[in-house]
């Protein structure tokens, strides 16, 4: 299977970053690996990650990205999954624009492609220096 050889991480929206950080860092004891005002990534066992991002309008809705697989060649994985019938999402909005394959490029050369499962949950594959 294409994705079975890659690590998976989870990411989801929070409505209040300070409150979320107090819980994840203070109560759960998670270690910060990437820190910015609206995005925090925690490094867990065996390099697995939990990513939270500030997006109050998406909290509790299926538009959240629920899991993300870290890959080292996103173009190849997008092509392989497309061949298997996966349809990638396309976005053209402030802060999130995808190319014709459905790949968005972010600061630091991070690349992400989003797709949905049969229930409409948003999942992604990501290529970034930390994956």
Regions found by a protein language model. Give the residues of each.
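Vicinal oxygen chelate
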Residues: 1-3, 78-131
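A short, glycine- and basic residue-enriched loop/turn
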Residues: 11, 38-39, 112
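Amphipathic alpha-helical segments
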Residues: 18-31
